[in-house]
Amino acid sequence: MGIKNLKSLLLENKSLTILDDNLYKVYNGIFVDTMSIYIAVANCVRNLEELTTVFIKYVNGWVKKGGHVTLFIDRGSIKIKQNVRDKRRKYSKSTKDRKMLELEKCTSKIQNVTGFMEEEIKAEIQLKIDKLTFQIYLSDSDNIKISLNEILTHFNNNENVTLFYCDERDAEFVMCLEAKTYFFTTGEWPLIISTDQDTMLFASVDNHPKMIKNLTQLFKFVPSAEDNYLAKLTALVNGCDFFPGLYGASITPTNLNKIQLFSDFTINNIVTSLAIKNYYRKTNSTVDVRNIVTFINDYANLDDVYSYIPPCQCTVQEFIFSALDEKWNDFKSSYLETVPLPCQLMYALEPRKEIDVSEVKTLSSYIDFENTKSDIDVIKSISSIFGYSNENCNTIVFGIYKDNLLLSINSSFYFNNSLLITNTKSDNIINIGY
């Protein structure tokens, strides 16, 4: 649930570590994302009675460790979550159909069991039938709400348990918002219990240590500004509840070491992080990049985005080139696209030294509007005359690639209005810098 791969990425980045749950007996309060835990428990049991027993046992165990438990409970409809609900209904129906087919097979199979260990085999199949029947029952969201509300009545008179209803906002969002307030009062975050990976995005909002738990594991999370950036970048690329992500891209533990991470979640930094491979513009579509980045930023910072209109999905290419369009359009005022490359270069370069008369004559000799082929030695000579180098550059201003003049950002990648080339794959690019 939530942001795909975020937990594994934070583990890979070493800010999230797994602890031995048995070594930690006492907490300064416990906050629970109720629905996520309830569903996790429901997937492990066979009937409502067992679900009730196990869930109550968990809560009572948390009370012993935390003194007081606050159960954050989703309530009401979240308007901006309609697309997510539609997808979940579709997925739920598909899952229900698959489980019903599996149930039919098990029902048929149990009737035909005979011979050696007949009773044991039937008992095993019956357990599977019971579990499938219960899972089909819970595939109806109304049944989930009814059964959860029934279980919660067991805590109505329990002074150690608070039921906190989150009207028209996600429980994990409200939980982390309240946990942040709790920190300002007590100087410590409560233990956060959730299976939703959005929780780790919200928990990265400050650099104070947190303890986060799901049903089976306990984590310590000490986020840096870089981890907060990584969490936001993962929400942007891989998607979250309110933004489907950048189609055609994914951040995984495998490619994380190729991605530059920063402290500030800015458009320039985001594009630099995404530039781990070459991209080519496939359409002329542009997207409102600032709106997307603002939404992710506000959501991650626990600002109330529930009145926003969530941004639509776009491809990673549309995001990248829309983000770079402003810089390219600014550059076009000093760019002559229709003349040969040496002339383009002379027009675009800002002199970094005085150019003497003999050098002007040399430059003049390079002006040949009929010759469309570029000579590497000519390119290097022009660069040198203007005070630039082609080797060992600390700052790269331009790159020359197949007669294309490309801009460079952070010396990390090159681009124009139709292609982006990463600096890690730039053996056939001539650098111009200083």
Swiss-Prot record:
Main subcellular location of this protein, as a coarse class: virion
GO cellular component, one term: virion component
Keywords, comma-separated and alphabetical: DNA damage, DNA repair, Early protein, Hydrolase, Magnesium, Metal-binding, Nuclease, Virion
Cited Pfam families: Pox_G5 (PF04599)
Cofactor: Mg(2+)
Amino acids binding Mg(2+) 2: D196, D198
Subcellular compartments: Virion
Induction of the gene: Expressed in the early phase of the viral replicative cycle.
An example Gene Ontology biological process: DNA repair
Cofactor binding comment, as recorded: Binds 2 magnesium ions per subunit. They probably participate in the reaction catalyzed by the enzyme.
GO MF terms, alphabetically ordered: metal ion binding; nuclease activity
EC number(s) from the headed UniProt entry: 3.1.-.-
Enzyme class: hydrolase
Residues that, per the record, bind Mg(2+) 1: D33, D74, E168, D170
Family: Belongs to the XPG/RAD2 endonuclease family. FEN1 subfamily.
Purpose: Putative nuclease that seems to be required for double-strand break repair, homologous recombination, and production of full-length viral genomic DNA.
Protein name: Putative nuclease OPG089
Organism in which the protein naturally occurs: Variola virus (isolate Human/India/Ind3/1967)
Organism lineage: Viruses, Varidnaviria, Bamfordvirae, Nucleocytoviricota, Pokkesviricetes
Gene: OPG089
